[in-house]
UniProtKB/Swiss-Prot annotation:
InterPro entries in UniProt: NA-bd_OB-fold, Ribosomal_uS12, Ribosomal_uS12_arc, Ribosomal_uS12_euk/arc
Keyword Ribosomal protein: yes
Name of the protein described by the UniProt record: Small ribosomal subunit protein uS12
A cellular component term, taken from the record's GO annotations: small ribosomal subunit
Protein family per UniProt: Belongs to the universal ribosomal protein uS12 family.
Biological processes per GO annotation: translation
GO molecular function: rRNA binding; structural constituent of ribosome
Pfam families: Ribosom_S12_S23
Keywords recorded for this protein, A-Z: Ribonucleoprotein, Ribosomal protein, RNA-binding, rRNA-binding
Cell wall biogenesis/degradation listed as a keyword: no
Function in brief: With S4 and S5 plays an important role in translational accuracy. Located at the interface of the 30S and 50S subunits.
């Protein structure tokens, strides 16, 4: 590191060089979060339900959180999405078309006691899942 009276240019150059040691700077500059994101930077995505899965809650909680494996239509990637609400999983069947969005954990990660689940189901066959859970709407028959 230059320390002299005329060392400004070297200090600037070095600080630009050593920025790449910062993990967050490198991820931001190389756009890695969008590249690795299954939704490709979009707020929501549509997908087809492959199967229903129960995910065990982390300690100290004890529960089986009802989730679904979804294959996204736009790129074929598979993600796990949480079905929010009491009995919500009963409104979701295999091969249904669902809309998912991020679960809202910090830094785009999972939330609460559900490990490895980053998404929530918002609608099933173009009907809001919450509306079906509270009984305001019925699931359309195909």
């Amino acid at each position: 590191m230059g320390q002299g009276k005329f060392a400004a240019r070297k200090l600037v150059r070095d600080s630009k060089k050593f920025r790449w040691s910062d993990k967050n700077y490198a991820r931001r500059e190389l756009n890695l979060d969008v590249k690795s994101d299954p939704l490709e930077g979009a707020p929501q995505a549509r997908g087809i339900v492959l199967e229903k899965v129960g995910v065990e809650a982390k300690q100290p909680n004890s529960a089986i959180r009802k989730c679904v494996r979804v294959q996204l239509i736009k790129n074929g990637r598979q993600v796990t999405a949480f079905a929010v609400g009491d009995g919500a999983i009963n409104f979701i069947d295999e091969h249904d078309e669902v809309e998912i969005e991020g679960i809202g954990g910090r830094l785009g990660r999972s939330m609460g006691d559900i490990p490895g689940v980053r998404y929530v189901v918002t609608s099933v066959n173009n009907v809001c899942l919450h509306e079906m859970v509270i009984g305001r709407k019925e699931k359309p028959r195909r």
